[in-house]
Amino acid sequence: MLELREFIREDMDNIDLGYEMLQEHKDAFKAPYAIHGYTLLEDGEIVAMGGVHMLWNKVGEAWIMLGKSAKSKPRTVAKYADLMFDVIVHKNKLNRIQASIAVNDAKAIRFGKWLGFEMEGLMRRYGPDGSDYYRVARVQ
């Protein structure tokens, strides 16, 4: 059975992404920033988590991390993600949430569009490996 709860920083250490995330990236989510997020669990295992880092008044940076088990339930995870962003935007009275999506990640680009994010531009050499990313945003 699926359970949705508020994101806690320790979730970063407990999600099985199917790849190793750099510690400095994990630490960014553990810092005392204003993070509003949720974690989706199934039988105690983290399926996905996501949320918004508050940048300044009415603006935030959206993020999602999918565990290995999310691949077996893409529609369910997508519906939870859409609901999660709606709740966070409403609860925090946000005008804008933005995100970064790797240019070579076609699935993430499609998912972002499905979530209502619109393409705003190309961020050259933005990624940790120097790769290009798109800036996308959902503006109310």
Residue spans of the language-model regions?
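Short, small/polar residue-rich loop motifs at catalytic or cofactor-binding pockets
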Residues: 32-34
